[in-house]
Every structure is written in C-alpha cells, then in structure tokens.
UniProtKB/Swiss-Prot annotation:
Family that this chain belongs to: Belongs to the UPF0304 family.
NCBIfam families cross-referenced by the UniProt entry: PRK05445.1
Disulfide bond positions: none
HAMAP family in alphabetical order: UPF0304
InterPro entries per the UniProt record, alphabetical: UPF0304_YfbU (IPR005587), YfbU_alpha-helical_sf (IPR023146), YfbU_helix-hairpin_sf (IPR023145)
Protein name per UniProt: UPF0304 protein YE1336
Amino acid sequence: MDMTNAQRLILSNQYKMMTMLDPENAERYRRQQTIVERGFGLQMRELDRDFGEMSEDTCRTIINIMEMHHALQVSWDNLKDKQDLDERRIAFLGFDAATESRYLSYVRFMVNTEGRYTHFDSGTHGFNSQTPMWDKYQRMLAIWQSCPRQYHLSAVEISQIINA
C-alpha cells in the first residue's frame, strides 16, 4: 500500500481516535497506528488486505453462486422423486476462511448486511467451508447456466451440478 506522508498522518490520527472510541479493540488500533506511522512495509500489506478491493465481476460471480444454490434448493423442494439426492449436498457451504477470505467476507456482507439469502444456513462456522470451494463452484455454475430451466431443475440436472 503506497501512501504519502500526509495520508499516513491522517490514517494514524484515525487509528488514534478509534482507540478512544473503541477501547475493547484499542490494542489492535495502536498496533495499526504504529505500523502506519513508521511505514513498516511488510505489515502495511495487512492493512492493504483490510482495504482490499473486489472487482464487480467477482462480486457478480459470488452472487451467481449463491443464486445457483437458491435455485438448487427451490428445485429440490419441488421434486416429487428425489432419486436418492442428499439435501446436504445442495446446501451452500460458503468459502474457505484460510484461502478465500475475501469471498467469505462478501458472502457474510450479502447475508448479514444486505439481507439477501438469509434462508441459507450459515452453520456453526458462519459460511466458512473450511476447504477451498471457488473452483468447484465455477464448475457447478457452468453446468447450471447451461440448463434451460434454471429454477425447475430435474433430479438428473441437480445431480450433474452437485457432482461437477
């Protein structure tokens, strides 16, 4: 993160104010203030993650992934013959906190702040799948988007999507 001295001073002052406004997290803000004031390059990358950017395309892809899971659930609910489909395989698991934290953060924002897909079960880990899911979801999306009736999927189509 490249910042001018003036920008670093402004951010340092913001962290100083946050220590007073939020005493429970004061130690964290003091640490961040020190990093900014001294310009520690390695630790500045941590701040870059906090202020990172997610492209519009990535956001739309995540929404499409969540919408696909909604469609899977609606289709599964409407099936008369479930053909040994396990409902747990249809559930949206989220993303891996260790390797896909930005995606996970966006999912939590969409559910908790925007109020979308609130019917999804966040589980005990708050949509942390604890295993990387991005590639799997991409394969699933490709199949789902090729289905002619995306919200009226057959058992065979559901099976193809979840087994992608």
